[in-house]
């Protein structure tokens, strides 16, 4: 199959609807023909893409990530940031060896209680990082601290937005 190279300007016209598997959690697993067709990606869901979701409402701050196991993840809070590091060890597949690693950093809102942060992983691999919000006058200390990832026995029930 011949593949033409598109100038980035043409992809911009589709904006957030243009999904590229090269930049999601499936990186390193190979591309399918439909990944090279821009309009095919319009029909894929966000949950299928491995893209993280950040929610912040009046009561809590929430980060949702998927496709992980607890052994792959390290979660820590450093000052006003949550750092999530994941590493899949090298394994062999039909085409050679695959090794994946990622590092994501999210800024915490200033009114999140850093001493009450929690992190859990559902049975279907959905990581949920949650922190309650406090009144604006209260401020937690600024230091580095690891957040343990607890494992849930049931699948996630995170609603789609």
Curated annotation (Swiss-Prot):
Q: What compartments host this protein?
A: Cytoplasm; Nucleus
Q: Which residues carry this modification: Deamidated glutamine?
A: 6, 40, 135
Predominantly, its location class is cytoplasm
- On the tree of life, the source organism's domain of life is Eukaryota
**Can you quote a single GO CC term?**
nucleus
Describe, as the record does, how this protein assembles with itself and its partners. Heteromer composed of three CRYAA and one CRYAB subunits. Inter-subunit bridging via zinc ions enhances stability, which is crucial as there is no protein turn over in the lens. Can also form homodimers and homotetramers (dimers of dimers) which serve as the building blocks of homooligomers. Within homooligomers, the zinc-binding motif is created from residues of 3 different molecules. His-88 and Glu-90 from one molecule are ligands of the zinc ion, and His-95 and His-142 residues from additional molecules complete the site with tetrahedral coordination geometry.
Family named by the database record: Belongs to the small heat shock protein (HSP20) family.
Q: What does this protein do?
A: Contributes to the transparency and refractive index of the lens. In its oxidized form (absence of intramolecular disulfide bond), acts as a chaperone, preventing aggregation of various proteins under a wide range of stress conditions. Required for the correct formation of lens intermediate filaments as part of a complex composed of BFSP1, BFSP2 and CRYAA.
Q: What is this protein called?
A: Alpha-crystallin A chain
Source organism (scientific name): Trichechus inunguis
């Amino acid at each position: 199959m011949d593949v033409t190279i598109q100038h980035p300007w043409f992809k911009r016209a589709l904006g957030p609807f243009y999904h590229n598997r090269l930049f999601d959690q499936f990186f390193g697993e190979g591309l399918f023909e439909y990944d090279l067709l821009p309009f095919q990606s319009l029909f894929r869901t966000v949950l299928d893409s491995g893209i993280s979701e950040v929610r912040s409402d009046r009561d809590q701050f929430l980060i949702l990530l998927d496709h992980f196991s607890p052994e792959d993840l390290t979660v820590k809070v450093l000052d006003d940031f949550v750092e999530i590091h994941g590493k899949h060890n090298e394994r062999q597949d039909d085409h050679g060896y695959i090794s994946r690693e990622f590092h994501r950093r999210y800024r915490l809102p200033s009114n999140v209680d850093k001493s009450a942060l929690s992190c859990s992983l559902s049975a279907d691999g959905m990581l949920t990082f949650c922190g309650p919000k406090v009144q604006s006058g209260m401020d937690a200390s600024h230091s580095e601290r690891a957040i343990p990832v607890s494992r849930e026995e049931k699948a996630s029930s995170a609603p789609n937005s």
